[in-house]
């Protein structure tokens, strides 16, 4: 694991319907992420937050809400993440809603030719403007990173696609729209739903996921949406879905990722302090970060 790490926050809530997730980066910092990682021996550089332009009024372009502002912020993020990679540091991005994965993945994939992606998420984030029931771009970043959807999203960073379907794994899915299910089947993407986790156990699921995502890749990006966890353990998220990954399953999955030593970047998204209880979800995010970055009890 690269011990030189750069943190960047993205106070973005325009990709989602519920306000408040723009305060996620501040909540995670307040929960002590820098101190925790420094105690683990990381050299931390906090680059502050990406500036997100706020719209003067509601806009929607071909079933994409706030398209201009989301694209602008993600282009900035892609450049910052690319600069971090150029400096030989590990980018840790704090959200913000999950639309910021557009910029994170665009910045990382410029430097990692065959990028793998592991998503811990209740949702697929595989919608396009043609399939999205809501028009919220936080439900589209994985599709766009694969090259599906509006060209302004697919071309963030100046190129498309960023990743191949065979190099992506979703873990913890339990709420997929019809268009997402059809796309998953059409492109043959590896998805471990909560059914597989319940049936096989998280350890076996992670063994299979790690083997799959590291087979033909040069590095792996972790995209962790806190709604992947059960709302009992992570209540402060905008789109909670009951029956999710437990707190301990989350730690096991990330401890196994740490042992595999395949990560080149990570993002933690969808922490919404307005919906949280005593910053519980931000504290869970920091605890999970400590596991994925190698913290051990013994």
From Swiss-Prot:
It catalyses: L-arginine + H2O = urea + L-ornithine. Mn(2+) 2 binds at residues 121, 123, 225, 227. One of its GO terms (molecular function) is arginase activity. Pathway: Nitrogen metabolism; urea cycle; L-ornithine and urea from L-arginine: step 1/1. Its cofactor is Mn(2+). The keyword Metal-binding applies. Substrate binds at residues 123-127, 134-136, 177, 239, 270. The keyword Disulfide bond does not apply. Binds 2 manganese ions per subunit. GO terms for biological process: arginine catabolic process to ornithine; urea cycle. GO terms for cellular component: cytoplasm. Keywords: Arginine metabolism, Hydrolase, Manganese, Metal-binding. Its EC number is 3.5.3.1. Belongs to the arginase family. This is Arginase. It comes from Brevibacillus brevis.
